[in-house]
Amino acid sequence: KHGHKGREWGAIIADPCCLGACLAPTLPVSLPAAGGLPTEFSSAQFRAALGMFATGVAIVTARGAQGQPVGLTISSFNAVSLEPALVLWSLGHTSTALGIMRQASHYAIHVLTVEQRALAERFATRGIDRWAGVAHQPGRSGAPLLAGAAAVFECRNRSQYVEGDHTIFVGEGLHCTHQPHSSPLLYHGGMFYTEHPLGRVAESALG
């Protein structure tokens, strides 16, 4: 999602196919011919509608060619596969981090807790040193790791797909950790939220 002026966010991928990873077998797909019905909404309307899909908030980190740490806030994180362990996220082509993320061999995705709201805003702000005063250490692949995240996925930069004005990154999980009782930082309609438990999901509803 995109934040307010001066903020740089990864875009949303609104994928309501299931609550877990989408594990249906791969089947041949017939795609419709190009063209079809014209678009009947503006970019602003499309963005506002996508904003109704509540997401978590994450920070992706990597290292540039000179070893410098790079990081940005995203809300496009999603599961792809359990076997192999694959995740995806997307980044707009106007992002200053795009070139580095395309070239990085590995990156780390940090799923943020409610206590990390300030960190989410910091890594979404342009024109500042996002790493000033931020403690981090190298992970197994060398990507910078931030402390306190609800979950961390260290990934190989497995594949990339250009679609429209974004690049979709598919990462292969090499290592992951999580804190099972942490409260998540959520993003919906341009505002931050946290959880309000309604009860466990029925087993029959899990994908």
Question: Which positions does each model-derived feature cover?
Answer:
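Short hydrophobic alpha-helical segments enriched in small aliphatic residues
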Residues: 3-5
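Basic, polyanion-binding surface patches
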Residues: 15-207
